């Protein structure tokens, strides 16, 4: 950060216009720099409303964006017993499975706010597993790979990310949900910074995962699969963070397997740039991408990552957004 400030004078922070997102961006900036952040940060707010493009809320640019998971039938199935159990304590009003589902959500917010909630004990472990699975299905089929426009809604941000990685101006000929008014100007969409911070929604992070085409996150969740990778509580919990780090390595970094078996001498590897992806502080191996090696450290060469996504605008994803 200090190096970035010394070389570029300003950090670059973007946020959508919903107040909670703006507040998060302001809090992060203050925590990063202290109260002097206003003197060290370019702070950009992009409008989240119909008629405005922004990769931080791409649903406004995608007319075909719609929920595809039929939630009510599943909720009635897993909360049927809970509804009957709670109804006996409520007189003069009917308790429905959707109301009970809302009660489970109250527990979630209460727990995040205060650390623990006695309210949660109203439900059994099986009912909480059903609640977790509800959100896994919702995010996978509403915003992720399970929705026909899931990758499309993450494509615009991926296009911007490639521009940042390669330090090249945004390409208007492949525009999807990007805001051309911002991205056409270097001061509003800089590509020369060492650190960028974008603040958006958990749904958008899910769409970006879909656009990245990481195999482990492309498998539809199943209730009886205890090892499923797409688990919303781990992928996009409250305060979810997706971080990409670029390493400039002046000395070679061979795959760990090559070092272990001493098959290839170090001098065979030229200096290289590597990319690492972290999701909520956990390293996400990039070996599932077509041009990335299978490495125990999860790294991929920057060129390999870029080559893996060179065809991203040729998949017809954005055409689905147009119906």
Q: What do these predicted ranges mean?
A:
Residues 1-12, 16-196, 200-323:
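Signature for phosphate-centric chemistry
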